[in-house]
Amino acid sequence: MAACKQEDNKKVFTRNDIKLESDTLTPEALWAMGRIGSYATSPDGSKVAYQVTYYSVEENRSNTVIYVQDIPSAAASESDAISSGTLLGLGNSPVWLDENRIAFLSKGEIWTMNSKGKSRKQLTNTDGSVDGFLFSPDQKKVVLIKSVPFHDIIAERPADLPKSTGLVINDLMYRHWDHYVESIPHPFVLDLESGEELDILEGQPFECPMEPFGGIEQIAWMTTGDVQDSNIIAFTCRVKKGLAYSISTDSDIFLFDLESRDVKSAKNLCKPGTTFGDAVAAAISSPIGDIDPSKTLRDQTVNSSENLANNPGYDQSPKFSPDGRYVAWLSMQRDGYESDRQRLCVCDLQSGEKRYVTESFDSSVDDFVWGDDSNTLYFIGVWHATVNLYRTSLEGQVTQLTDDQADWGSLQLIPRPTPNPSRNGGEKADADICTRLLMERHDYFHPADLYQVRVIGDSVAESSRLTAENDHILSQLASGSCEPRWCKTTDNQQLLYWVIKPPHFDSSKKYPTLLFCEGGPQSPVSQFWSYRWNFYIMASQGYVIIAPNRRGLPGFGQEWLEEISGDWTGQCMLDYLSAIDDACDSLPYVDRDHLGAVGASFGGFSVYYLAGHHNKRFKCFISHDGAFNLEAMYTETEENWFSNWEYDDAYWNRDRTPAADRTYKNSPHLAVDQWDTPILCIHGEKDYRINATQGMSAFNAARMRGIEAELLIYPDENHWVLKPQNGILWQRTFFAWLNRWLK
């Protein structure tokens, strides 16, 4: 067993009482904001424990602390509902063990404390660091997520050369997102009475949760109403490695009986009649089957109509119904397509029947939770550029419950309080008669706060804010405004774009204007809040922003979503130009002589492409982590299923499809001879999704052609910019470049 670990004695950062010199949002004010993370309701529904991360720019680091706050049981006005949470101290990932005890992570172990932050005790004492945890219903066991060594692809260093840094690699997926893969996560079950640990995937070279972003939500304990039954676990796993992993998104949900201790007997809920052992055998005997790894899986046998019934796409995030009869999970239909429509699948564990209960919602389900009747599910998803709350029955009757110009985030069911037959002369409490959900909400001008949402009747939900984490900063700022606008595209479709206006907006003036190019390429331009691509701070610097929901974005139906794959430089680029041209023609405050185009990832690719095809519309460009040379990108990226699906074919195939031929012939690097506009290129050298050589190549090409250009390179950042001082440098460089050319 590992030695007891002391909690961190470093200076603890808490809420920053920054006093602003003006009402303009600055990078420093943005990084002074607290960021609400995971949260959990108490078993009686009266309190919420939640984490907030604070940053110190001076020390260039962050810490996360836990608060507890009351949840009103009855309808309350927002001013009455908001209260200051009680700070409990350092920690993250809080969960309630009972009405008074909270478990949380600190320094790689599980700790407990009471609801006032006192009596802090280390609960686990395990080898390795715990990255996530989930208690069994009877709280006698807990699943721990820990990393185990993995050397199937990167060889172990020779024992006599312990300081060598070279890596001997024999297959693909040797690096993922921002790290070389020399360990993978496994789920362990710890018996809290005996101290025994069981690695569910012991000896298996497969991940659970799935990298790089999967967490404890990919694992669930069965609930049956009998808290003594704590032996069944559902877990998510992609039973593949190396080349097979790199070209496939096929993950499954497995049902593991802890009493058997044999993961190979775990039932595969996605592929009925098979087990985890069957998947392992297939992974060994025929890792890729008859798949051609240099072509899209779109038309290969794995996605034939016969195979689609076996869920060959992403399946993840299982959740059992309260009565234990059903398990639901998020499911994509096709293998190799990471942006397929994510549906809500429900499996009846008694009959084995699977059904999809969100088919009438022509967009993706982002998150969901069971209602306490085991017949209702609540979910969130994007539609027409906002993320709202919906409800579905087991028969697939979908009802929209909120209709806000905002994005609602992850959701939890607030338990009903202990029954009390009568209050106030026989009238039942509000919490007794309605479903209550705990959710987070944000929009372009407000970072995330927690809300209580009360579902009343068939189609109405009312919300009240519980936290006001950053009101002390927001109250010092002048807010901008935004509005949706529709325009006609070149193929006579209707396109929605957001118009974001600066604070103190004066309609009689003209403003420099930015075209925002979204990434993904299938990520929504909804009411997101970002600490980098933040429309509030852009508007505060005096810019109007035009943010189109171009072809390829979710929330406008599957046909609209799929019109981008294999056509990166086609209609989606015309949609960008339709939006900015409509804004210039219809909005008198848009200064057509001072336009810029900015974007990241696919948005950065879009900027590189527009640089050679904009017909002098724009006066400057900014590309962050964008793809520049698609032939190089095809084999540089680590998740090859992405380039296969999006490009349609490998660049070396003589029989490549017309879509692939069009993709490579229109790669931005082939139009550098048409570049004529200043460009800022930004890239992180730990970005293994789109390698930094892409940004360097674009910058080098621009300078060799005599074009004004700058390169902001981060040796220690990935696809994102995560460190405080790097983030502020990013914002300063971003606006210095825009101001130089547009003001």
What are these model-derived regions, one by one?
Residues 54-58, 149-152, 240-243, 333-337, ...:
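Short glycine/acidic-enriched loop and turn motifs that connect beta-strands
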Residues 241, 469-593, 600, 635, ...:
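Cap/lid segment of the alpha/beta-hydrolase catalytic domain
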